[in-house]
C-alpha cells in the first residue's frame, strides 16, 4: 500500500503536476507527480521538495490512475 498527501488535484503546468509526497508502509518517502499524457504517477526516491505533508490512504483525484509498475522508478 502506498500513502500520499490527500489533495483534490495538484496544479498542472504543461501536463505535469506539482510534486506530492508519497510514503510506503515502511515509512520510506518518495515524491510523486502526475503526468497527464502518461496516465500514471512517477516517483523520485528520497527527495521531499520541501513538502512534508500528512499521511492518508491513497485516494487519486477523479479521472487519475496509477501504473504500479512505474512506482519507485
Feature-to-residue mapping (PLM):
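Surface-exposed ligand/attachment interfaces on beta-rich extracellular proteins
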Residues: 1-15, 20
Amino acid at each position: 500500500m502506498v500513502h500520499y498527501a490527500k489533495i483534490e488535484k495538484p496544479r498542472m503546468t504543461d501536463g505535469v503536476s506539482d510534486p506530492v509526497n508519497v510514503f510506503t508502509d515502511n515509512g520510506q518517502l518518495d515524491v510523486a507527480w502526475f503526468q497527464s499524457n502518461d496516465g500514471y504517477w512517477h516517483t523520485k526516491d528520497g527527495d521531499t521538495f520541501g513538502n512534508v505533508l500528512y499521511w492518508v490512504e491513497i485516494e487519486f483525484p477523479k479521472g487519475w490512475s496509477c501504473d504500479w509498475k512505474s512506482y519507485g522508478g
